[in-house]
């Protein structure tokens, strides 16, 4: 069912300038935003309906400024999930806007000024249309949302038994256990948690108690652990599944059961989705297994949250920048001196193309340049550690402006970059950006004409490696990559 989210922004709406793209679309495909110092001038959306691309109208007025475009690939099952923006109610201007899909996040479009931050989103739903108010500027924006249908992968294995289906309306799989006998998996039990946090258990196969108990596999969804893939083996003659092995973004289960040398192997999984439900066939044994998938979440860690103390001005030193998210980080460039980190540049992987984003001034007297190269895609950044200080104060950490003094990067291969910057001084505070089982896929922060003032990151769960083990830190230090 489609639901209308009321527009956010100007309270002085005129019916003459109201617009509505409607909700009769399957997905949003392209977004054009023209921004300037006077705020968002116009916005335009492209949609898709039954495979046909639809070009929307311009909403607003084109003046001096710059146009940014954000593309959403509906062919890869990518959906628009949310919109964030900044609106100044005093001046009646929308200054900045940012879009998030199930696969990536756009860079911030426009400029962040002091104003009200708003969000258009609804849990478990995607945006399929927009409405709002625009005259010489975009003044208000609302949206239409509808439920996201989980993707269903057909059952794999042999033929036999009766069909069963747990559905795909759960939040997560939390535990897998069962029994096995000389033929293979006898019964299997899946523990789920629904979207309201309530547990539920489903058993498939006989419940006679015969066979030996398999080692249970628990998944801590509260710690952002997600079931991502399954390897299975079945006997082609009997059709019985002989063994199963489950993989999350953090660990791999023991092999449940056994398999013959001539067993047929199958895999269920997708690197950008998590498994939230199962279906298949079972009788005296488990014969086949299929799954329901939904998208993995991107995690945004704010630089404010990574400090041990509350930041001066709530961390608002300098101007906001946001690169959004990409497939991964290939190289970092750091420009620093004895006082602070002056400039950062990140080389990202954007579907095989290198996209670079630079923030802060690198032309400063006595600045040093350092770089750290990743063996991407086999190696990813898993954490950033840094030291910040406060300048223009003789009192305490609670006043003044924050400046980043040093940065250190760690990777999934256990390498640690050199420390870029100076770790000594007064009013120092350490911070760390890390999300267990996840890789950094983008950065955001604050900078000014002379320094980097804050650094945050976007994290995405890491897929299991080919040997069945999740990419994780393994110890040991690495050296300086090429500059």
UniProtKB/Swiss-Prot annotation:
Record domain Jacalin-type lectin: where: 2-147, 150-295, 307-461
GO molecular-function terms, A-Z: carbohydrate binding
Keyword terms, alphabetized: Lectin, Repeat
Pfam families named in the record: Jacalin
InterPro entries registered for this protein in UniProt: Jacalin-like_lectin_dom (IPR001229), Jacalin-like_lectin_dom_plant (IPR033734), Jacalin-like_lectin_dom_sf (IPR036404)
Source organism superkingdom: Eukaryota
Start and end residues of each stretch annotated as Disordered: 1-20
Family in the record: Belongs to the jacalin lectin family.
Protein name: Jacalin-related lectin 13
Lineage: Eukaryota, Viridiplantae, Streptophyta, Embryophyta, Tracheophyta
Gene this chain is encoded by: JAL13
